Amino acid sequence: MPIAVITARGEDAAELSAVAAATFPLACPPTVAAEDIAAFIAADLSAQRFGDYLADPDRVVLAAREDGRIIGYAILIRGDGGDQTVELSKMYVLPSRHRSGAAAALMRSGIAWASDHGAAMLWLGVNQNNQRAQRFYRKHGFEMAGTRTFRLGTGTEDDFVMVRPL
């Protein structure tokens, strides 16, 4: 069955949270403590938090569905006020569905959403050790633009900032 990307709804929060809990650890460097990963998932990727994300008018949660179940998701956040940028805050696909086209479908839908909402630029942060994600983002037109730090539990991770003009 083909992969469909939809705008997620409130009733998807629990399933999105389950996908997030299964996929977020895969993007973390091996040096990150399991307790820090678990704390991040509990604080930022719970069903309740997804409910908050889904209710936020400045965010969209896109869900990739296959055979009626969510296999991946992306969260995009509009910039404040006159800021014409959109952040691709999160984008993950279940490992069993890597290379299925789900990530590319989510990216196309995310780019279209950002463009449709007046953004001139899409940006994201990606861990400096996550070569696979960096290759994927470059393939979709993103370029390195700088660095940032990302707080993960008791540690701080170094991210590259990548941008894509729309």
Segments from the language model and where they lie:
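Acetyl-CoA-dependent GNAT
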Residues: I3, T7-A13, S17-H98, A104-W113, ...
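C-terminal "cap" of GNAT-fold acetyltransferases
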Residues: R9-E11, V86, A120-Q134, R138-L166
